[in-house]
Amino acid sequence: MKVHQIKIDFNVTEQIKRFVYVYILEAESLYLIDSGVYGSETKIMDYLDSIGRNTSDIKGVFLTHAHPDHIGSAAWFREHSGCKIYASEGERLWIEDIDLQFKERPIPNFYNLSGKSSKVDFVVKDGDEIRLEGGAVIKVIRTAGHSCDEVSYLVGDCLFIGDAVPVKGDIPIFIDEQEIRKTMNILETLEGIETYYPAWDRTYDREMMKSRLADAVEIIDMLKNTVLELDDGTDLETLTSQVCDRLNMQMLKTNPLFCRTINCLRGGAIMTKS
């Protein structure tokens, strides 16, 4: 099975530019790992045309989690190709009801990024194996923490990890300290994986992934230790500002997603979908 990586550029605001990677698994049929933001179907379909494939070849979209830059064009592909949508139970509610997601996790430009709600045809869980046309198997591995029930997808010796790993130089976004640490341990101890496919960077071999995981644990520990040192029971907004000043992250002071990270590190309520 051949893997194609497509970079999707988008803007959260006019000033905040981001990107995400969508992956295409190509065999007799095609399968997407995540779907980018709303409107990504145009770039994806242009790419498919360049390799001699078309919409009807897409049989499934496997979503790692429910955030807008991953689910944005899922509804479009389901409608136009008849493909099935796969996601975990914990992420399903926000995929099937983006209004609920906006209510519980508002971000700028939300609806322009997330597009439309999409039905999840198949709910997956840790350990599930889905047999694709042509005989390939996708195995589901729960890698929560960044979101409440994120999953990674293992195909042969390739692991598609979405946003499971915090990245140096980017906004550390996770909602559950225990889960994110558990995920780092799971990814470190998995055997037989040769290539890792993140949603936010080029592919990694095993040694590079080992380094990225060490960086991620360092980020989590640094934030945790800073929170423990500074937290005197003050309100969350003030604590977040103090952490940002201490770590020279002033640009994150008003970022609501980073504020949630600080909240979980001080032992605040875990924000899950209900």
Say what each PLM segment does.
Residues Q15-R18, V123, G134, A144-H146:
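A short catalytic or substrate-binding loop motif that flags glycine-/basic-rich loops and adjacent residues
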Residues I44-Y47, S73, I180-T183, L223:
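A general structural detector for well-ordered alpha-helical segments in enzyme core domains, enriched
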Residues G39, V137-M222:
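Metallo-beta-lactamase
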Residues M1-F10, P108-N112, G134-G135:
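Short Pro/Gly-enriched beta-strand edge/turn motifs at strand-loop
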Residues M1-I51, V151-A164:
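Conserved beta-strand hairpin/beta-sheet module of binuclear metal-dependent hydrolase folds
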Residues Y31-I33, F62, I85, C158-F160, ...:
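Residue-level marker for buried hydrophobic side chains located in beta-strands
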Residues G39-T42, D49-I130:
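Active-site HxH/HxHxD metal-binding segment of metal-dependent hydrolases
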Residues E188-T195, R202-S274:
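Accessory terminal helices/loops
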